[in-house]
C-alpha cells in the first residue's frame, strides 16, 4: 500500500518539501496548484522534478464548485475542468479531486449532481483520467460521505469515484462503519487527518488544527478499519492543515507524518488482523505498569 502526503502539510519551498517527503520514505505526494504557481517551473517540469526524486503524484487538488450549477455557470465549470485536465496531463498524473460545492448558486439534488459527474466522467475517459468526489464537512448541499457516495453511484461511470477524508467524516460525528458498504474499487483516494475534540467551526478547525493520526481525538482506528474492510488498495495519504506544522522543519514534520501512518496501520492490523494490510514489522508494544517517579511544582504561596 502506497503512502502519500499533501504538500500543504509541511513548510518550506517546493524543492524543500520534495526533499523532505522523499527522505521520510513516502511513495508520493498530493500536489496543489499553488505549489507550482509559486515555483519557477512549468507543470511538465514540476512533474519531472517530482519523479526525479523517486516520488509520484498521487492526486491533483482541489477543483472547487463544480456540481449543481445552473447555466451559464455550469458550462463554465466544465470549461474550467477541461483546463485542469490539461494541467494534470502535463504534470503526469491521472487523478483529480473535486470537493463538494460551496457556491452560493449551486442547486441541490442527487440526480442533478450525478448527471454532472457522468458527463465529466465521459470527458475524463477520453483523456485517460479519473475524477474523485469528496464531501466537505461544510459543503453547501453535500457534507456527508454517504451523499457523495450516492452521487458517485448514480453517476455510474468507471472514471468517477469517491474520495474519503477522516476529518470530514469524523468531525461531523458520522458513523465510520457506514463506509463498509461502499465497494473498495469505487474509493479512489483516502485522506487521513486527526483533530482535537473542541467546539469550533468545522471549516476553521480543519484549516488550522488538524493533527497527525494519533495526535487528536478522532476515531482514526475505526475509520481506517472501515475503509480497509471495503478492499480499498489505493494510497493512504496525510492531509494536515496546521499552522504549527507549516512553521516547522520540513524534514521533521514529514518524518513524524510517515511514522504516524505506519503506527495507525499497525494499530488497525492489531485490532482487526483479518484485514489485508501491508504493514512493516513493528516491535512489540510496551505497556506502562505503575509509577516510579512523580514531580510536583508550586509557585509563591501555593
Language-model segments: what does each one mean?
Residues 28-29, 119-217:
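Acidic/histidine-rich catalytic cores of soluble enzymes
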Residues 13-16, 56, 67-162, 171, ...:
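Active-site acidic/histidine proton-transfer and metal-coordination neighborhood
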Residues 6-10, 32-34, 62-65, 101-103, ...:
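Active-site beta-loop-alpha junctions enriched in small/polar residues
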Residues 35, 295-302:
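Core segments of cupin and vicinal oxygen chelate
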Residues 2-4, 28-30, 54-61, 94-97, ...:
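Structural preference for beta-strand elements that scaffold enzyme active sites
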Residues 5, 21, 29, 50, ...:
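Conserved, mostly hydrophobic/aromatic
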Residues 18-23, 38-61, 82-92, 115-126, ...:
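Acidic (Asp/Glu)-rich catalytic clusters
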Residues 1-14, 291:
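Boundary/entry segment of secreted carbohydrate-active catalytic domains
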